[in-house]
Swiss-Prot record:
The keyword Protein biosynthesis does not apply. The chain crosses the membrane at residues 81-101. It comes from Canine coronavirus (strain BGF10) (CCoV). Its main location: host cell. Keywords: Host membrane, Membrane, Signal, Transmembrane, Transmembrane helix. Belongs to the coronaviruses ns7/ns7a protein family. May function in the formation of membrane-bound replication complexes or in the assembly of the virus. It is found in: Host membrane. One of its GO terms (cellular component) is host cell membrane. Residues 1-23 form the signal peptide. The keyword Membrane applies. It is a single-pass membrane protein. This is Non-structural protein 7a. InterPro entries: Corona_7.
Amino acid sequence: MLVFLHAVFVTVLILLLIGRLQLLERLLLNHSLNLKTVNNVLGVTDTGLKVNCLQLLKPDCLDFNILYRSLAETRLLKVVLRVIFLVLLGFCCHRLLVTLF
């Protein structure tokens, strides 16, 4: 019974982590879209001027590759956590059925 309770507890924690990761993914997408919009609105051919304008608006995240890599890592982590969640859910159901019958 104690193993079952631990599995349920870990399953709930994984669900909370998945929710937080979805929020992080939305924030990263929003940040990426904001930078693309600023980039398209400026439409300046001189990249130096464009980067300077972007630095004024968003100084902490200029590299799109880093942003996309973080987004990909967030999505991968979310998939891994969902797989772990499904395995633990199956284990909980199995333990519950064994306990009842």
